[in-house]
Amino acid sequence: MTASTDRYAASLRLSVAPMMDWTDRHCRVFHRLLAPSARLYTEMVHANAVIHGDRARLIGFDPVEHPLALQLGGSDPALLAQAAAIAQEWGFDEINLNCGCPSDRVQAGRFGACLMREPALVAECVAAMCAATHLPITVKCRLGVDDDDDYALFARFVDQVVAAGAAMVVVHARNAWLKGLSPKENREVPPLRYDWAYRLKQERPGLPVVLNGGIVAVEPAIAHLQHADGVMLGRAAYHDPYVLHCLDAALNQRPEQPRESLLRAYQPYVESQLAQGLGLKHMTRHVLGLFHGQPGGRAFRQVLSEGAHRPGAGWELVEQALERTDTRSWRVVA
């Protein structure tokens, strides 16, 4: 096993969910600084976009982001296979198929969560991607759609995609309601059923199972790891990113670093992007939650939110934002 594959294998325990409009390359670099051992995921990119679009913009990444997975959307096996081959050329560590997004636009394109009703098609897609690349092909899914209330149906879906070659499943442990709820509501309203994911792992001990959904703190995340191979943080990693750092530190028996130190570690990357003509707001929007719940946290967000969009804004604005925080919040909490 090479160092890169060993690092990829070790990253199974903690990952950051693919989140549209959030987990872009700038966010992922920041998350890598917070969580050196975590597995990172891109935003979902449709297979057609990978094949025909501006790849540098859509799937380009900084080498520091490894281990990194590309999440693909789509339901055409041939197109997904072609996109998977491109992903291998670009150096990704994993390809993940989205079978969990419930948005109307995604449904209209016949991909995302609605694919849970077509397990044979998903299996065909997985098999095609496996034939096109040596990278591990994984699937992110829900427990079911709409009123599905049948563990056996969920388990059969998983068994079909695993038989086709899926190396791992990420289970968002709630149903997707395809009508009547927004994507945001679909992350909150359908009840969580962690026990289904636990049972899946118990009955299939050789299958890597990663649990996603409603994980917002270190202690519950560690408790979930008694029943699953990994945990995937979603909104918590974005709105309160220090939780991501603390969980990565706990899992790897490393001391937690002060928030200010983590932010300053981001400075060289930010300044390199500024030098290329990118606006400050593209980087700082991902750090707004770093002082969540801390003295001065609201003022920190306000300074960055109001100033980062201005022409010529630079790192000095981040320094101004830091000055608004209470320095006591920078200490390491025992």
Curated annotation (Swiss-Prot):
The record marks N98, K184, R187, R298, R301 as: Interacts with tRNA. It catalyses: 5,6-dihydrouridine(20) in tRNA + NADP(+) = uridine(20) in tRNA + NADPH + H(+); 5,6-dihydrouridine(20) in tRNA + NAD(+) = uridine(20) in tRNA + NADH + H(+); 5,6-dihydrouridine(20a) in tRNA + NADP(+) = uridine(20a) in tRNA + NADPH + H(+); 5,6-dihydrouridine(20a) in tRNA + NAD(+) = uridine(20a) in tRNA + NADH + H(+). InterPro entries: Aldolase_TIM, DUS-like_FMN-bd, DUS_fam, DusA, tRNA_hU_synthase_CS. It comes from the Bacteria. The keyword RNA-binding applies. The active site is at C101 (proton donor). GO terms for molecular function: flavin adenine dinucleotide binding; FMN binding; tRNA binding; tRNA-dihydrouridine20 synthase activity; tRNA-dihydrouridine20a synthase activity. Its EC number is 1.3.1.-, 1.3.1.91. Its cofactor is FMN. Keywords: Flavoprotein, FMN, NADP, Oxidoreductase, RNA-binding, tRNA processing, tRNA-binding. Pfam families: Dus. FMN binds at P18, M19, M20, Q71, K140, H172, N212, G213, G214, G234, R235. HAMAP family: DusA_subfam. Catalyzes the synthesis of 5,6-dihydrouridine (D), a modified base found in the D-loop of most tRNAs, via the reduction of the C5-C6 double bond in target uridines. Specifically modifies U20 and U20a in tRNAs. Belongs to the Dus family. DusA subfamily. This is tRNA-dihydrouridine(20/20a) synthase.
